[in-house]
């Protein structure tokens, strides 16, 4: 299997409380993989913004981080997607505020639109830190899609590179497949059987993907969700 190669890593940057932490995480990731880092800011360029970005990037200049700051105005989703194509980004990092119901946040945010439409790998960063904190857990979407095998493989290769403790593959099931009106014991049993069959089907599909990944990358880290 070929080693994962992120020649260019992009990150969408906004002036949120996590800006410095997001930049630091992206810079460390770029250095780890020997990648160029592209900061994508949706908005007009200004001297103040540029100085802020340069200030946060300055600790990594001595480590020979190659980077570029890109300013573009427009719709956030359109700007980020077009910028990843223009700059030939292999991995896009998006800072996401963690909420109690992360799934609800993910499904209702622009992050979903970007992850569905992006032509590159996407990493949602929910616990950024200014100082390095070892990554312990990666969650990857295992939905049925032509790109899923590549996505899951990349997640395990990255996890191996970062030394994570656990990689969770989350399976998505269409609600229409499990839509059964439960109004008596018979319909309840039917609903339970359908859900169990779907669970077994999805687990078998994901395990088939995992069987193609080197065992030393998946050993003691796999969790299906």
Say what each PLM segment does.
Residues 1-55, 59, 63, 136-192, ...:
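Small/aliphatic-rich secondary-structure junction motif
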């Amino acid at each position: 299997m070929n080693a994962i190669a992120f020649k260019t890593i992009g990150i969408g940057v906004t002036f949120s409380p996590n800006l410095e932490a997001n930049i630091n995480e992206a810079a460390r990731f770029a250095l780890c993989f020997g990648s160029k880092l592209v900061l994508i800011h949706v908005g007009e360029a200004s001297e103040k913004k540029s100085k802020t970005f340069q200030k946060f990037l300055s600790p990594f200049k001595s480590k020979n981080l190659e980077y570029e700051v890109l300013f573009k105005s427009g719709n956030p989703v359109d700007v980020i997607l077009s910028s990843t194509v223009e700059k030939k980004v292999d991995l896009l990092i998006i800072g996401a505020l963690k909420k109690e119901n992360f799934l609800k946040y993910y499904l209702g945010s622009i992050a979903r639109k970007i992850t569905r439409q992006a032509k590159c790998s996407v990493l949602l960063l929910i616990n950024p830190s200014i100082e390095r904190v070892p990554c312990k857990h990666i969650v990857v979407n295992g939905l049925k899609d032509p790109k899923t095998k590549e996505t899951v493989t990349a997640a395990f290769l990255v996890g191996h590179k970062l030394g994570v403790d656990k990689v969770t593959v989350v399976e998505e099931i269409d609600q229409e497949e499990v839509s059964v009106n439960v109004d008596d014991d018979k319909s309840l049993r039917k609903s339970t059987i359908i859900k169990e069959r779907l669970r077994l089907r999805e687990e078998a599909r994901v395990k088939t993907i995992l069987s193609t990944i080197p065992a030393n990358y998946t050993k003691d880290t796999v969790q299906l969700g």
